Amino acid sequence: MQIAPIFHKVFRELYGEPCWNVKPGYGSFFTLEFGKPHLDVHEPTVASKDASRKVRRLLARRNIFVHGEWHLRIASCAWEVLSNGKHVGNGSTKPSMRRAADLLDGQKLIRFSFLPEKAWSVFEFDLGATLRTVPYDRKGE
């Protein structure tokens, strides 16, 4: 399948790169890091007067996150991870998401394809994993 030039331009730098720190996020969000790691430091800030005690406490902390040169977030869609064609996990439950993350972690992205007529995306990895995304519904495309 021929991939549109814009997708080739975006993904060509990721081909052959191992993903790391693959993890479930909020809801069914799913993130993968690629490339050299760097620290993202969020300095403490002062909350507004009407902020709750919990918010004030959280904003008073310094938060440090490790990110890659490229950050791929799978969000606002249904997704599934397969290993050599067999279902491993999806966004339905945290344990299912964790199984999917564990399988993908360390695998190298080798191919991306997009099926515009169905709005499906397919990410293929070197050790047999496949990550497929589909819209939640046709109206949500």
Where are these regions (language model features)?
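Surface-exposed, interaction-prone regions used to assemble/regulate multi-protein complexes
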Residues: M1-E141
